[in-house]
Amino acid sequence: MAGFRNHLKREERKEKRKDILMKRIRPDRCRGASDSRLPSPIPARVYRTLDEEVKRRYHPIPPRYEHLPAFCLFLYAVAAVCLILLIIQSGSVAFSDWFNLHISAPLRAFLAALTAPLPFSLGEFTVLLLPLVLVVTLRHAIRRRCDSWRTAGVFIGVLISVLLSFFSVFVLNFSAGYRNSTLDVKLELEQKQVSAEDLADTARILVRHLNEEAGKLGFERDGFSVMPYSLAEMNDRLSDAYAAFCSSHDFIRNNAGQPKPVLVSEILSYMHITGVYSFFTGEANINVNFPDYTTPYTAAHEMAHQRGIAREDEANMVAFLVCIGSNDSYIRYSAYLNMYEYVANALYSADANRYRTIHAELNSATRGELSAYNRFYEKYRDSAASKVSDAVNNTYLHTQQVSHGTRSYGMVVDLTVAWYKAYPEK
């Protein structure tokens, strides 16, 4: 008798669970013979227990919706391995150096080669389409997938696995660049406390080079210099310059990646973003709304990221060295002028009188270009978007062990001073 009573209790519990599930299904989602709407979904285990007449009003949820797909489990496993790799990278500079050169470099080259034939930035389109994809995905999930707590949990698990795939790509492609040996060590530079005199000496060298290069360029009536070729031609010249630089330095590997213009450059201008490296597509993206003289140097900066130079001051420095090694006058001019802005700002803060003296030695065309840039930049200077963008970028850099955050961009001044102390003739 006891066994029979237990059997009845089990059957009662099954019936109660079935009743609960049936009550959760909205009556307006059921269909009759003349209703063109799809039948309401119901868990397969409940569907199998229904009478044939009742089954006509429902359809079983596909079993794949009630279990994480094998591919998602694979993504979770890869993310776990990448987390271990990230921990090792954070604790070992030597491992990060090796990983960046021998694991990340081939993967970066593969992604760059994969997306290079596209005439647009896949990374940009991914970001722009993301809101639409999220809306469509959530709508599909609510209407067709999440019919029970189990299927909702599976759906969330799938979304998390997709997010983790971005984390895995970041670790495999780029994170070691934030944790490897610093550029001053690689270039064998001796970095010391920078004095106002050091800044003045470096600024004078840059002014001398700017005066030499400016005489070879054309300037518009609005004060800006004119890049004498297309973006595609600029990319070819920068690729040649990078090939030469990478062949003479063993800490960087070249690849076929070239910068791509961003369609929403005006929006990026309000965010104070001149370029961005898309690590998940291997693309270097540049803001083409800014004046010409910023474009080659910005492109070279993003190409440095594309080749594994992750820290911002180091990407600035590599871009500078690559550009001044170019055979093209405008690319050299772009590098000298962008670096002069960094050094001159630091000199002005340290010794305003010295800054004014040295700035007066700059040729009138370049001084006019800097004045024109100030007028151009005025409408973007204090935008709300820039404050949000700066906060996000600053947080991201801190998470990558860049203690100075967005201020690290300006730390290229220390590297430049050390470079010209070691190589004053260059």
Which residues fall in each region the model found?
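Auxiliary, metal-adjacent structural segments of Zn-dependent hydrolase domains
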Residues: 218-288, 292
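Pan-zinc metallopeptidase signature
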Residues: 367-426
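Post-HEXXH active-site segment of zinc metalloproteases
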Residues: 311-337
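Active-site recognition of the HExxH zinc-binding catalytic motif
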Residues: 297-309, 316, 320
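Transmembrane alpha-helices and immediately adjacent membrane-cytoplasm interface residues
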Residues: 136, 153-182
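Cytosolic-side transmembrane helix boundary signature
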Residues: 129-160
